[in-house]
A protein has these predicted regions:
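Generic low-complexity, intrinsically disordered sequence content enriched
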Residues: 13, 20-22, 53
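Beta-strand-enriched cores of mature, soluble protein domains
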Residues: 27-170
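Signal peptide processing junction and immediate N-terminal pro/mature segment
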Residues: 17-29
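Bacterial N-terminal signal peptides
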Residues: 7-15
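Positively charged n-region of N-terminal signal peptides that target proteins for export
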Residues: 1-4
Length: 170
């Protein structure tokens, strides 16, 4: 009977130690998540298009035209550097389009150097592009490793174009 009591005591102590360790780990993760969220910043920058190369890749009479765009951008401000962008666009009507894209930005954000990828989703109507941006998870390199964020811009035909990006690091 005494051996069974000792075994039960050892198991109970082991379970309590594991539970306390998991609770401590969970509390640590919660604290880090709060710090990461509270440390988010907003980057404000302007950009200009250095190049824009648009080509049709599918067009059948009477249907929306599909194009592919390769563009390069130059950033100034809290984001400083170059962007290489690929868009896929669908023109609904003349002067109206929907598009998606990926852009690798290389340079610095808030004084941290490296690169990251932005995912673009937008529309073009009445001469104005409205774009939402999100940092692709896991795309940060260098000092921008662990970067996350969302932002956007509205742009007409009057460069430079203003944009914002709310960002943080894990």
């Amino acid at each position: 009977m005494r051996i069974i009591s000792i075994v039960v005591l050892v198991i109970t102590v082991s379970v309590l130690a594991l539970t306390q360790g998991k609770t401590r780990d969970a509390n640590q993760k919660t604290r880090v998540a709060r710090e990461t969220t509270s440390m988010r910043k907003q980057a404000k920058a302007t950009f200009t298009l250095k190049s824009w190369d648009e080509k049709n890749y599918d067009e059948i009479g009477g249907t929306p035209k599909l194009t592919r765009v390769s563009a390069t951008k130059s950033y100034k401000g809290d984001i400083d550097g170059e962007g290489n962008l690929e868009y896929l666009m669908m023109y609904r009507t003349a002067g109206s389009a929907s598009f998606i894209g990926l852009e690798r930005v290389t340079g610095s954000v808030g004084g941290r150097s490296g690169s990251f990828v932005l995912q673009h989703s937008g529309t073009f109507e009445g001469g104005v592009a409205k774009v939402t941006l999100s940092v692709v998870p896991g795309s940060g390199i260098g000092d921008l490793r662990g970067m996350s964020g969302e932002g956007g811009f509205e742009a007409g035909h009057q460069p430079p174009y203003a944009m914002t990006l709310d960002y943080g690091f894990e």
